[in-house]
Amino acid sequence: MCSIILRITPEGVFIAANRDEMASRPWEPPAKYWPGICGGRDILAGGTWLALNQNGVMAAVLNRTFTLGPAPGKRSRGELPLIALREASADAAAAAITRLDAGLYRDFNMVLADARAAYFVRGLGTGQPEATPLPEGVCMITSGEPNDTALPRIARHLPRFAAAPFAEWGGLLADSSGERAKQLNIPAAENHGFGTVCATLLALPRASQPVHLFAAGPPDVAAFAPVCSAAPG
């Protein structure tokens, strides 16, 4: 179960994310693997879990509960951010995803954002995905609904992110304490090879260019460093 946290403000949208995956599944850190898009690449299926385009639009995809991994007859969910990032705004990206057939994919959550708006998108295996604008404030999403405090991870960590400035969010992502259901940074060696494999910090301010930082490993081990701009060139 991946985690993504957003702070949505009049000054912009600020994002922190941990990617949880089987440690044996190969991936590459963010780069310009696609024209005008900077993001990590899943080597197995060729898509991405989180990426940023040259227009300052971010798209991320998360598995919903009990849907880890591929399934026969289903397309890779990693192509969904790439579809969204053909667009020039979060509004247009949300509209593009809601025109798709959700039945082509295993169940998914998506987060779409730019400096002016953020959306939660759910795809539940039938019909078309549904997009919901996220209000100002702090929002945490994992494998279910936004800010669902019935989920132990959200119940524990949402108040911590809400109380901390964005400059401290990288340290919060690194927290591996607590029982498994509440852990934000999961040690793969202690969980049958499944755990937190990398992390992202992304600022989308209205008044300046995006700032994209990436930790190429669990965030208590790997340092955050700047990665490619998605701008042309």
Segment roles from a protein language model:
Residues 1-233:
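N-terminal nucleophile
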